[in-house]
Swiss-Prot record:
Coiled coil: none annotated. Keywords: Amino-acid biosynthesis, Aromatic amino acid biosynthesis, FAD, Flavoprotein, FMN, Lyase, NADP. Homotetramer. This is Chorismate synthase. Its EC number is 4.2.3.5. NCBIfam families: aroC, PRK05382.1. This reaction introduces a second double bond into the aromatic ring system. HAMAP family: Chorismate_synth. Reduced FMN (FMNH(2)). The keyword Lyase applies. NADP(+) binds at residues 39, 45. GO terms for molecular function: chorismate synthase activity; FMN binding. The lineage of its organism: Bacteria, Bacillati, Bacillota, Bacilli, Lactobacillales. PROSITE patterns: CHORISMATE_SYNTHASE_1, CHORISMATE_SYNTHASE_2, CHORISMATE_SYNTHASE_3.
């Protein structure tokens, strides 16, 4: 299962093509729209989120509510395009139109300057339009398909925010996907402990008032994953590495940890490894899950615990200094639009990106021409594991 995304932030539409989804999987536009809506919510978001109410149009690969094995094309219209038709036109336009919304003041922390240098652009809008986090809409759309597939296989994924800037959100060590959904899933801050919500809102409002932004840490958990996805035999088959790469590919994500994560570097080994136990009904399990469900680049059958750190949103209403690329004069960086934080939305992106990698791995490992074939292969595999 592989995919591509395309589309500019203010272009006519965003597109994703997914290939390799098993035939026979029930899939509707509504399945995807639910996830798109989640990405657009969350405390601290404004502006464009109110303009756009994303709706997907499926234009290939699905017939009468079921996938047919051919590439699935997903389209999301940018409703704002009507105000950008000439500026974003594919055909050549008059010079005076080219000057409208031209960007020559690169924003620190964005792709603007380096992208312009790399691709020889005079108008840095060519960079902004594609490097914008608007692209994550399609990662969520693809993830929605992946989650639908995983759900059929009784594999579930959820996320919650564990840090907003300096504010740590308390949550128990043992946390099921169901519990995350019932708590963080109902919170506009995407947090487990609702008693911290009021303080957090005040904190975010203060950051906004100061024209500043905050980042944080998001945790995604995956349940129902059998042992043995990924492999130790080659560097590029290690599933933890694939997940880490996918998470860092999300705009503004700068690091990933599994289980104890960086804390593992500070503890002696006796306080890090998970002891192996065996029982008649469960087979091999671990007495704890400090390694976050991975050993040797493979899932070990425990819950996957992945955390990603998101840097603060780089566009500040209290703009940072930059250099105008035409005049080389110092200038205050342009503000296209910005929010104090996008953590709850970024959590939805992360959850869907992790789901996509797990679904890809499953489709690679097992016969996956049809969903029935895949289900059967997984049942047989789990049976084999239980007899080991
Ligand atoms: C869900 C989400 C929403 C984002 N919203 C904004 C935003 O409103 N303004 C902004 O400047 N950056 C936003 N970003 C981050 C930028 O897209 C990102 O920092 C930038 O493209 C540079 O990429 P890098 O941080 O990965 O180096 C957002 C990121 C995510 C994941």
């Amino acid at each position: 299962m592989r995919y591509f995304t395309a589309g500019e932030s203010h272009g006519p539409r965003l597109t994703a093509i997914i290939e390799g989804v098993p035939a026979g999987l029930s899939l509707s536009a509504e399945d995807i729209n639910i996830e798109l809506k989640r990405r657009q919510g969350g405390y601290g978001r404004g502006g464009r989120m109110k303009i756009e109410s994303d709706q997907v149009e499926i234009t290939s690969g699905v017939r009468h509510g079921k996938t047919i094995g051919s590439p699935i094309t997903l389209n999301v219209t940018n409703r704002d395009f009507k105000n950008w038709e000439q500026i974003m036109a594919a055909q050549d336009v008059e010079d005076k139109i080219k000057k409208q919304r031209r960007l020559t003041k690169p924003r620190p922390g964005h792709a603007d300057l380096v992208g312009g240098m790399k691709y020889e652009f005079e108008d840095l809008r060519n960079v902004l339009e594609r490097s914008s986090a608007r692209e994550t809409t399609m990662r969520v759309a693809v993830g929605a398909v992946a989650k639908k597939l995983l759900h059929e296989l009784e594999i579930e994924v959820a996320n919650h925010v564990v840090n907003f800037g300096r504010r740590e959100i308390s949550s128990p060590e043992h946390l099921s996907v169901q519990e995350i959904r019932e708590t963080a899933g109902r919170s506009d801050l995407s947090i487990f402990d609702e008693s911290q919500a009021e303080d957090l809102r005040t904190y975010i409002d203060q950051i906004k008032k100061a024209g500043d932004t905050i980042g944080g840490i998001i945790e995604t958990r995956v349940e129902g994953v059998p042992a043995g996805l990924g492999s130790y035999v080659q560097y590029d088959r290690k599933l933890d590495a694939k997940i880490a790469g996918a998470v860092v590919s999300i705009n503004a994500f700068k690091g990933v940890e599994f289980g104890l994560g960086f804390e593992a570097g500070k503890r002696p080994g006796s306080q890090v490894m998970d002891e192996i136990i065996w029982s008649e009904n469960k087979g091999y399990t671990r007495s704890s899950n400090q390694l976050g469900g991975f050993e040797g680049g493979m899932t070990n059958g425990e819950q996957l615990i992945v955390r990603g750190v998101m840097k603060p949103i780089p566009t500040l209403y209290k703009p940072l200094m930059s250099i105008d690329t035409e005049s080389h004069e110092p200038y205050k960086a342009s503000v296209e639009r910005s929010d104090p934080t996008a953590l709850p939305a970024a959590g939805v992106v992360m959850e869907n990106v992790v789901a996509t990698v797990v679904a890809q791995e499953i489709c690679d490992k097992f016969n996956s021409d049809t969903i029935n074939e895949l289900k059967k292969a997984l049942v047989d595999y789990k049976k084999r594991l239980s007899e080991y």
